[in-house]
A protein has these predicted regions:
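Short, small-residue-biased leader/transition segments that mark boundaries at the very start
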Residues: 1-3
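C-terminal regions of proteins
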Residues: 205, 210-218, 223-274
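Flexible, acidic/histidine-containing loops and adjacent segments that form or flank the divalent-metal
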Residues: 19-171, 243-246, 250-274
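Active-site-proximal loop/helix segments of hydrolase catalytic cores
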Residues: 5-24, 113, 140-220, 224-232
């Protein structure tokens, strides 16, 4: 593998990388991830935590989710001779048409301070089943997401947002678990984020997009990675996205593969463009 990107240090995103790095048949040349050490320098850290070790504390967020004896993800990558780089707005890969459109260093700094506090979020469990039955107007769809607060997780807000453009006029916007503030910041710093094929943030949660943001992004295709509960994906998110494009979800289609080749069995949208 030429490059791997860990968008943020939540267990459902970082966990699989430990297996990859411990697999002798897998070679990763480059690893992109962000940690508080990138933006919190020694003097600031010592004022906040005079009795702690800056490097180990800043990397705690990338500890193994369950194995306390494992190296953290950064040290494990370095021990495997991976080149580890921070990924902030403006970074462009030297050989692959992929660039970082968020977060900026300034946006990430206050989030890094919160991450160091080791804030633990309650796990968002929901075992109800997604359904799109019954009347659901455009007004209802918008209010069901716009009246909700922004995702307050600092790790989600600090997600790396990537833009992949393999050919002209074919763009993929990969939003990780970015929240509304992060996506707004990315849009303000980049002029070419509309009309992309987007990976919808945070499993289609109603706390990570608004109807206004969706209209600004105006995606030509929306893909959600979700288990198909009432919250993930949000019915309101799906409806607002479908004003612009077909909406796909892994809970309906399984693994989704985008290809430029002709296909005989295309994936079935969760909701077709309205």
């Amino acid at each position: 593998m030429c490059i791997r990107d860990s968008t943020h240090p939540d267990s459902d995103h970082k966990g699989g990388f430990f297996g990859l790095l411990n697999d002798r048949d897998v070679i990763i040349n480059e690893f992109w991830l962000n940690t508080p050490e990138d933006v919190i320098k020694e003097d600031e850290y010592n004022r906040l935590y005079p009795k702690r070790n800056r490097l180990s504390h800043c990397r705690e967020c990338y500890d193994h989710p369950t194995d306390t004896d494992s190296l953290n993800l950064i040290d494990l990558a370095v021990s495997n001779k991976c080149n580890v780089y921070g990924a902030y707005c403006g970074k462009i890969h030297s050989h692959i048409p992929i660039s970082v459109v968020g977060p900026s260093l300034d946006f990430y700094h206050p989030l890094a301070i919160e991450i160091l506090k080791n804030n633990k979020r309650r796990k968002d469990e929901d075992n109800t089943i997604y359904n799109d039955i019954g009347y659901f107007s455009s007004v209802q769809a918008k209010s069901s997401i716009d009246d909700e607060p922004d995702d307050c997780s600092p790790t989600n807000a600090g997600s790396i947002i990537l833009l992949f453009e393999p050919i002209t006029s074919c763009k993929f916007l990969l939003l990780g678990d970015a929240n509304r503030a992060a996506i707004t910041d990315a849009i303000s710093n980049n002029t070419n984020l509309s009309g992309c094929r987007i990976k919808v943030p945070h499993h289609g949660s109603k706390h990570n997009l608004t109807s206004v943001l969706i209209d600004k992004l105006a995606p030509c295709c929306a893909i959600i990675s979700a288990k198909g509960s009432r919250k993930h994906p949000s019915r309101g998110i799906v409806h607002c996205l479908s004003n612009h494009c077909n909406v796909y979800s892994t809970h309906k289609s399984g693994t989704l593969i985008h290809t430029s080749y002709p296909i005989t069995t295309p994936a079935i949208p969760l909701k077709e463009k309205q």
